[in-house]
Design a protein with these regions (language model features):
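Active-site-adjacent, His/Asp/Glu-enriched structural segments that form or flank metal-binding
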Residues: 58-60, 69-131
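His/Glu-rich zincin catalytic helix
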Residues: 1-79
Length: 131
């Protein structure tokens, strides 16, 4: 991972771009009691078109916000409830340009991080849940 140092504010960050195109940033805070994780995608409320494998698709207005809520659905139940049951405070938002999912917790950080990364990378949609 590339290390960046921000001397002016006494911070350091580690950054790496993964093979799938995602950029991972880590800000170590060993003196903090609470952990915080944030996952964002460059798809927000203003986005009504996307390209996948060279094919452009139009989507209805509001689909980013709709997906923000639907992404918490999992095969096993609901990731929002799973995170809360682990003592985390989860939330999500859709801005004009991005959709973000995050949580903060004082315990079970790694387990909560696995839940977050799982539901954003393995969406679970059924016809019943979409109707």
């Amino acid at each position: 991972m590339e290390q960046l140092t921000f001397d002016r504010v006494g911070e350091r960050m580690y950054r790496e771009k993964l093979e799938n195109g995602l950029t991972v940033c880590v800000f170590p805070k060993p003196e903090f009691q609470k952990g915080y994780a944030f996952f964002a995608t460059n798809y927000g409320g203003m986005d009504v078109r996307f390209c996948l494998d060279g094919v452009w698709t139009d989507s209805p207005a509001g689909v980013a916000h709709y997906l923000e809520h639907k992404m918490f659905d999992t095969k096993e139940g609901n990731a929002l409830q799973d995170l809360a049951a682990n003592g985390a405070s989860p939330n999500a938002f859709t801005s004009s340009a991005i959709t973000g999912y995050y949580f903060e917790s004082t315990e079970k950080f790694e387990e909560n991080l696995r839940i977050l990364l799982s539901f954003v990378s393995q969406p679970w949609f059924t016809q019943e849940s979409v109707d």
